[in-house]
Amino acid sequence: KGDCYVKITVDGAGKEGPVVLDLFGKAIADRIPGPARMPELVRRLPEAGRKAHTEKYIAQNFLGYQYLRGAYLAEYELKGQNLQGFILDCGDTKSAQAVVSRFAFAGNAPAGALAAGGKAFRDRYNGDIQLGWQGRFVWGCTGGDATQRQVLAAAIAKSLKGGKLIQ
């Protein structure tokens, strides 16, 4: 709500768990000013194939890298394959280019040629990653096969364009 993103989860709460979480969440939301909606970049993650309630915000160390900060992500199932799509707002074009360059030269070998969604990398820790970037944004996905990663990365780019965040 407003500029805040709060996600509450619990394990082993029994039947009452969802009811208590809902009441607790509403009590928090009532104290936060602004409209009740997801942050802009969560709304830019495509809905097609997105698994319900998997949206997250990772403030730092996204994918285990200190320089990957402020990632909005969600889990997807496309053609029976599990993927994770993400968007980072790097603040400006220069910072986004620096993030991509640093990732590319961090020992991540190319996993394929330039594609519609950007560039594919083979990350030694996270497997194959499809990255796209334009302006201040970096986006991409992990998991699934190369085709589904390209499809999801292209869908994220299209959604960013639809929100007029990139051209």
Q: Which residues does each predicted region cover?
A:
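Soluble, non-membrane globular domain cores that form compact, hydrophobic packing
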Residues: K1-Q167
